[in-house]
């Protein structure tokens, strides 16, 4: 599984948090980024499709509920898998 630079930045926030985060949480913890809410939504969907993250439940925010996400592997597992797959490409 190869991730884009922006996807890796999302993964770094998730790995560093140590807990499931919502889209709003990701935006709050990435204040130095100029991501829009819709951009984070697209990045999260891409990470879900690649199997890098999974839905970990729902959290209530004011009057609505939002999904929270967590990584499917540790940072170390991701890099080990990436290195292994690059070494064994035909």
Which ranges hold each PLM region?
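Basic amphipathic alpha-helical segments that dock to polyanions
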Residues: 10, 41-50
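Short alpha-helical segments that sit at the start of domains
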Residues: 1-13, 17, 74-75, 89
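Short acidic, hydrophobic short linear motifs in intrinsically disordered regions
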Residues: 20-30
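Short, cationic-aromatic polyanion-contact patches
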Residues: 3-4, 58-80
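Glycine-centered, phosphate/nucleic-acid-interacting loop/turn motifs that mediate DNA/RNA or nucleotide
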Residues: 51-57
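Amphipathic alpha-helical dimerization/coiled-coil segments
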Residues: 78-90
